[in-house]
Amino acid sequence: MESLRIYNTLARDKQVFVPRQSGEVRMYVCGITVYDYCHVGHARMLVVFDLVQRWLRAIGYRVTYVRNITDIDDKIIRRALENGETIKSLTDRFIGAMHEDEAALGIQRPDIEPRATQFIPQMLGMIEKLETNGYAYQAADGDVNYSVRKFANYGKLSGKSLDDLRAGERVAANDAKEDPLDFVLWKRAKADDPQGASWASKYGMGRPGWHIECSAMGCTLLGEHFDIHGGGQDLQFPHHENEIAQSEGATGQTFVNYWMHNGFVQVDNEKMSKSLGNFFTIREVLERYDAEVMRFFIVRTHYRSPLNYSDVHLDDARASLTRLYTALKDVQPDALALDWNEPHAQRFAAAMNDDINTPVAVATLFELAGEVNRTCDASLARQLKQLAGLLGLLGREPRAFLQQATGAAQAGGLAADEIEAKIAARVAAKQAKDYAEADRIRAELLDAGIALEDKPGGSTEWRRV
């Protein structure tokens, strides 16, 4: 099998992946700020790095996968005040909702899922190191800031130079800062902050800045120098750039070897975002589409490419996934183990080892499905199911998927017992040689999104289309 190659944002190129410790991978991914339901952009990040960790394990690595939860933030505080509830009540509720969405999408839970509020002492410890090393200062307003110009390599991840940067990207300009580009490490508490929004420190009561949270959790849980750091493309700057400055400023060593970023989700060629009002929650999508359809919709696009969200694309994903399940409907896979020397498995592995190239990997699944349809070969069916399983797909009994109510069927389509009743009426019409009535019932069902397949022996199977 070829070596895994990953596009490293830091190098701006694909590189052969070489872990710091042979056979082991330590990976950190920036998770979700839990003040609302997860949207499709979150779903993409969750699925993408679920695929990465699944593949790393599939090719034999022992993986420690950390994905954090931001459970203290200005947005969280505002939402809790608006709702008249405590910060913990709000964050616990949306963490629970996130876990439900993850389970629906077939996302395996990370090995460690730290909450920012569990690591306040470690964050303060890192801030004190930065102060000792000359990178941090307490401003007149009580905030502790990072002195960006003190870090010689600032901009190495994003490719931005200090002269080209402007204040205001995710961090508002502040007259108390020594430089407008400086960012906050510790926010001084405000008089009207609610309970649970601040902690005692040598700098006074306050709470951590967003960037220091991930630096402290990553270094504490994975070590000061680890293999992979991932997140959405929008986090490349300033969040990940600031993580590097903080971590390397505190420890004096390289923070992360490989940086991976997934692309945006777009609607009509614009980034999906709350500010533009063009976003959809995972739950809104799952009211209309099966969760595996949504996962397949994400999987079949390369993780670094834009993902264009539309009903047309989701409908196409549903039709494509239906084709894969249909290939397995009448063929029982054999029980042999996956053999990576099999040609389809080799092509699949080559694709996944080429920067997690899921479009090519999915194309291999369709090649297999076509051969299963032609040959009804049990070993090919097994390969299809096994390889798809590495992508978190085709895990259900085929007929169960094909007969489920999704999309329009959920919004008032025929229930299973109604379909069976119409099939029985069609059988009766055929037995009475009333073939016109039998054809009428078939056409009526097709209009309702139900396709019939007459099997040898006189039975009839159905599926939703």
From Swiss-Prot:
Zn(2+) binds at residues 30, 214, 239, 243. Keywords: Aminoacyl-tRNA synthetase, ATP-binding, Cytoplasm, Ligase, Metal-binding, Nucleotide-binding, Protein biosynthesis, Zinc. GO terms for biological process: cysteinyl-tRNA aminoacylation. The keyword Nucleotide-binding applies. ATP binds at residue 274. It catalyses: tRNA(Cys) + L-cysteine + ATP = L-cysteinyl-tRNA(Cys) + AMP + diphosphate. This is Cysteine--tRNA ligase. The gene is cysS.
